[in-house]
Amino acid sequence: MVRWLYSTNAKDIGTLYLIFAVFAAMIGTAFSVLIRMELAAPGVQYLNGDHQLYNVIITAHAFVMIFFMVMPAMVGGFGNYLVPVMIGAPDMAFPRLNNISFWLLPPSLILLLASAFVEQGAGTGWTVYPPLSGLQSHSGGSVDLAIFSLHLSGISSMLGAMNFITTVLNMRNPGMTLHKLPLFVWAIFVTAILLLLSLPVLAGAITMLLTDRNFNTSFYDPAGGGDPILYQHLFWFFGHPEVYILIIPGFGMVSHIVSAFSGKPVFGYLGMVYAMFSIGILGFLVWSHHMYAVGLDVDTRAYFTAATMIIAVPTGIKIFSWLATLYGGSLRITTPMLFALGFIALFTIGGLTGVILANASLDVALHDTYYVVAHFHYVLSMGAVFALFGGFYFWTPKIIGKTFNENLGRIHFWTLFVGVNLTFFPQHFLGLGGMPRRIPDYPDAFAAWNAISSFGSLVSVVATALFGYIIYDILVNGKPVDANPWAVPAFFQSTPEFWMESHTASSLEWALESPTPFHSFNMLPVQS
């Protein structure tokens, strides 16, 4: 018990993050199923026509999935576990800071769940816009609890980000220059910079909201000379980099997986790195594309349309580099590779709808419809989550030291693939038809597509239950694995090449035995 409470070992903390993320994923998935069941048919289904309750569920679904599932799993879990190992460091730069970064999250989650139980809950949507989040519309403590929850999770992420930046800059092994870093380490590094620059703005925005609610200030109240649009600018200045924080570690994981199962290095390594940095920088220059509908100046809208479309360029560079890596490789279609290929295909679709939504004139019609929901679930529910599953199947043999059942893994992939596409593809049509977000009832005309969408969500739940069984199966029935479970014997060579230098994996974690020892490196490795 003490080992896990007081642990300063990056691997232990990474494991805690991953367990926490699985727990949060169950809660978030439960919320999403409630949403889809309520929308399965027109009229009242399960929530007794309680629109406030519906919005509380929507809000909780978003917060749990973003702050307690994707970020802890990608940045906290895989980041903590793999970054020190990949750069040849004995641990993170600030191990005890790492410990508190994790332990701030459970209280934060408890605060968020508690907010649903006081008064009527926080039914603001994850954006928490005033005046809906103000004292008139949400009297009682629920929004305040949600704000404190965000504060804690934000502090956790910022401390973690400082830790990652320091670690990557100062603790690389001899010979590992920045231009030799594995792409996943680059991804976490860029993500940490984004976190460090964007979260303080969110903290300021929600702190001013807190004082508006409790201490009679009027930052967002026009009656006292404030402006609710100020909140939107501050929130989205954080909110847009945030969505790149969610996807960039996924880029890094997919690069490793595609490289390993194509049997060759990633095409255009340096281009990949600069593409990630460009995406990160541009992410701070496009926030108002979430606000085309609030009456921005026409020149402002023109700028944000153009800037948003420019983000598609580095993103396209990454997509085509992955395709070039695949092209001519000796492909092995394993479970992680399936998830990586699914990621590339579905992320591209999500990116295309993003370019469509970038157009201010079009977005005025599509804003706050299910078209937007479909867009960001294609990049998150099939981008970030598929990358996470790919990373799970790719690195779990290394982390736990046991294999998973390949057939079950493939069934998991195909079930989930069918489920998420059934869920979210019809939502494009609903959005084009004008069905608004965050409303638990809708006209009969939308019934058919909603029924299909809700059925898809049940398919996804089946896939998720299967994943739970797969975790059990690994722990109980998994066979022990070698240092590199993905190695292939090199034919026509006197030396078994995968002992010397593997074609299937080039980063340092595959040089250690599986499961990775508690102290990774007794002597620092040296990279030529």
Curated annotation (Swiss-Prot):
GO MF annotations in UniProt: cytochrome-c oxidase activity; heme binding; metal ion binding
EC number: 7.1.1.9
Membrane topology annotation: Multi-pass membrane protein
Cellular localization per UniProt: Mitochondrion inner membrane
Pathway noted in the entry: Energy metabolism; oxidative phosphorylation
Enzyme class: translocase
Keyword Cytoplasm attributed: no
Chain residues carrying a lipid of type N6-myristoyl lysine: 318
Protein's name according to its UniProt entry: Cytochrome c oxidase subunit 1
Organism: Mycosarcoma maydis (Corn smut fungus)
